[in-house]
């Protein structure tokens, strides 16, 4: 069981997504180890400005209506390990985020971002997280109808923005 799973023990819905960066593992790892928060902020703000919208960390369009919120991300731990018998290296960042303003209106996310080489020139970003919907029982009902899809789309966009930023920044 991973650290997030051990911490939350399935206390919320799960989200998993991945993307890749066409740069060697060591360069991607070093960029995220050096200052992951700046990478996350730069990636999401750059994506928001490209879309000519208000800069926000998480954003998703639902039926043509944009939902955006700034988030406060904290990196709880960074660890390096070997994935398999072939000594494939991996780095895991334990993340937590919540809305920067009015956090009770948005889910709390606890996640792992694992980084490992796919090839000598490509690196995988693998996100696995659990989130707690707001509003208790009512929030769980809303989550079952539409909330989980909103959370999935926003996390997918976040990882896509981070991967896109790293592709350009490391070029």
Task: Give the predicted meaning of each segment.
Residues 91-99:
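Short Pro/Gly-enriched beta-strand edge/turn motifs at strand-loop
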Residues 12-18, 90-92, 108-110, 122-126:
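Intrinsic-disorder/low-complexity, polar/charged segments enriched in Ser/Thr/Lys/Arg/Asp/Glu/Gln
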Residues 2-70:
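Hydrophobic ligand-binding cavity/cleft-lining segments
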Residues 71-84, 109-117:
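Hydrophobic/aromatic beta-strand elements that line small-molecule binding cavities or substrate pockets
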């Amino acid at each position: 069981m991973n650290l997030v799973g051990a911490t939350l023990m399935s206390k919320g819905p799960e989200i998993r997504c991945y993307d890749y960066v066409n740069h060697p593992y060591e360069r991607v790892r070093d960029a995220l180890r050096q200052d992951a928060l700046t990478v996350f902020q730069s990636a999401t703000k750059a994506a928001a400005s490209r879309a000519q919208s208000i800069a926000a960390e998480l954003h998703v369009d639902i039926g043509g209506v944009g939902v955006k919120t700034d988030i406060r991300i904290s990196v709880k731990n960074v660890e390096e390990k070997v994935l398999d018998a072939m000594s494939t290296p991996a780095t895991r960042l334990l993340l937590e985020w919540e809305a920067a303003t009015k956090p009770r209106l948005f889910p709390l996310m606890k996640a792992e971002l694992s980084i490992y080489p796919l090839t000598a020139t490509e690196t995988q970003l693998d996100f696995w997280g659990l989130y707690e919907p707001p509003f208790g029982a009512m929030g769980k009902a809303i989550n079952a109808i539409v909330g989980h899809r909103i959370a999935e789309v926003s996390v997918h966009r976040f990882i896509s923005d981070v991967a896109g930023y790293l592709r350009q920044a490391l070029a």
